[in-house]
Design a protein with these regions (language model features):
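Short amphipathic alpha-helical segments and helix-helix/interface helices
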Residues: 16-21, 43-47, 119-123
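Active-site cleft segment of glycoside hydrolase catalytic domains centered on the general acid/base Glu
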Residues: 106-130
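Functionally critical loop-and-helix segments that line ligand-binding/catalytic clefts
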Residues: 2-10, 18, 23, 147-214
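Anion (oxyanion) recognition and catalysis
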Residues: 22, 50-53, 127
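A generic secondary-structure signal
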Residues: 20, 81-89, 121-128
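Aromatic-lined carbohydrate-recognition surfaces of secreted/lumenal glycan-active proteins
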Residues: 127-148
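Substrate-binding cleft of extracellular glycoside hydrolase catalytic domains
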Residues: 2-12, 31-112
Length: 214
């Protein structure tokens, strides 16, 4: 497998899809599922990206920036909501991944306790919403420590290492190439006469990352 070049952004990319592929050589775009429609991946956008030859990845992210957010019940709710967006809005293919964000420098105690409970809830929510069918795989976005811990505990199949190199375990995780996706510091790119601020990303050269097309 080749190492793929991608980006993530809160911006809708429908009008930029062809140029992102043809002019900048992006292979994939990572977009959002959430309760905020303004930043969410839309069906039209997913179709435009796919038609341009790009793959898509998605992350569920709302308020996962502090320990108190992460509970079993919150995981169930988020897993269920993410399933509905993936299945009913986008038509995301089975077997692909939905990443869930741990967007802070979580301690080992946080990861062993509330964050792991949250991811257990995510699985339960996805399972229940899917009528007892494990339709989507679960990924984690976060620090190296978060990625390593949640994969070792079996509650995340994929890991997306955040750009925050000062977070616990992140530099070691990057050096060991343990990630499926890695995020880099923001950069500005010119597309269709506009300057967009995006986060560059890349896949691991030898592993899939749960990306998809529609």
């Amino acid at each position: 497998m080749a190492r793929l070049k991608g980006l993530d952004t809160t911006l809708e990319l429908t009008r930029y899809a062809l140029a992102l592929r043809a002019q900048h050589g992006f292979d994939f775009a990572l977009r959002y599922y959430s309760h905020n429609a303004a930043k969410n991946l839309s069906l039209g956008e997913a179709r435009a990206l796919s038609s341009a030859g790009m793959q898509i990845g998605v992350v569920w992210e709302t308020a996962g920036t502090y320990p108190g957010f992460f509970t079993l019940a919150q995981g169930v709710a988020d897993g269920s909501a993410a399933y509905r967006m993936a299945r009913e809005v986008i038509g995301q293919p089975p077997g692909s991944a939905i990443y869930f964000a741990v967007d802070y420098d979580a301690s080992q105690a946080d990861l062993d306790g509330p964050v792991s409970n949250y991811f257990t809830g995510v699985h339960a929510g996805l399972f229940a919403a899917g009528g007892g069918q494990p339709r989507y795989q679960v990924g984690v976005y976060g620090s190296g420590l978060a990625c390593r811990t949640l994969r070792e505990r079996g509650v995340a199949a994929f890991s997306w290492l955040s750009q925050s190199t000062g977070f616990a375990g992140s530099q070691e995780y990057a050096r060991a190439l343990n990630y499926d996706l890695i995020q880099y510091l923001p950069q500005r790119i010119e597309v269709e006469g506009e300057v967009l601020l995006v986060d560059p990303d890349a896949t691991h050269p030898d592993r899939p990352a749960g990306l998809f097309q529609v």
